[in-house]
Amino acid sequence: MTGLEHGPLMRRALELAERGGGRTAPNPMVGCVLVTSDGTVIGEGYHRQAGGPHAEVVALEAARAGGHDPAGATAVVTLEPCDAHNRTPPCTVALLEAGVAEVVYALSDPHIGKGGAERLRAGGVLVTGGVLEAEARRLLEPWLHFVTTGRPHFHVKTAQTLNGRVTRGREGEPWITGPEARRLVHRLRRRSAAVMVGSGTVLADDPLLTVRDWPPQEEAEEWPEVQPVRVVLDTRLRTPLDARLVVTAGVLPLWILAGEDAPAERERELAGRGAEVIRVATGRTGLDLAAVADELARREITGLLVEAGPTLATALLEAGLVDRWTMLLAPDWVTRKGALPVLLTDAPYVGFELVEPEWSIHGPDAAVTGQVRRAG
């Protein structure tokens, strides 16, 4: 195969990889396409969940199940095949035993000594790396951050008006953004190991924090149903017992991170309804966010979407814990008293910039996302 032919196949592998979002942590999302020398796709697969078979193995099994011999085929995979025996055997062994002739991958394994490119080459396999590397790096950004820093990747999402208001200042007002932009939020939830809000958002909006509007209806049968862990930062355990998050805690995971001195009786009441209350240290104004990050890392949450109100967004930004920010922008201008700004801070200056921003249009709304770099 020529390098020009690898791009579309790698793009398909990336599409497959995303289907595993929300279930693979602490492993990455990985997709694989097996193709013959004449360009016929004989097998596809993706890593569905931690502890399960890796994408390459799934694709090999799919090829054999379809009556195809993978010997001599090319494996197009989003991440360099692993050469380490952890929860599953090395993918290099499966590929070599299958007689695959060529392996094309997007991104090198960041774990020193665990990538399998050299072993594959030693076994006579033609290996090419770096195909659509930027796209793969973008998809795997939370996982890469986790394995290189040991801390979960915090992706903050806000919805705001043109003048930076996240509420309209009056109860019962409609959503800031329309259904197309909200569908993007559901896609981001679907990719994430966890979704986080503060107690203020729970009290104001009574969110459910589930994935409902993704994938598209016509693709629904091809995607496994996935719901992220729902996380609430609630120093004093103010979350109501009849909140939708609590009512559904028996069937969907809910972690409530509370201060060490939060009421024990309230913890028992919440636990009785299925929520898990996790005690963490407190700081000057609430939970110690570094301790929160450490606890989530201990629980192998590689990345989370933070649907932040002004208080939580400000606290995370000031703590240096915002890695990516997605802003949904509605074509409205709201000056009503009580309409809250994106950030609430007494600091004389809080600035940041979005690195390599990506803009998109969703119905009447716009979205911009980028990695966060503190300015000033």
Predicted regions: what is each one?
Residues T2-P28, G43-E44, H153-H155, Q160-G376:
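Enzymes that bind and transform nitrogen-containing heteroaromatic metabolites
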Residues G31:
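Helix-turn-helix
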Residues L34-E135, W255:
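Zn2+-dependent cytidine deaminase-like catalytic core
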Residues A84, T88, G129-L132, V147-R151, ...:
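Short capping loops/turns at secondary-structure boundaries
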Residues I112-G113, R137, A313, V334:
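Generic structural signal for helix capping and beta-alpha/helix-loop junctions
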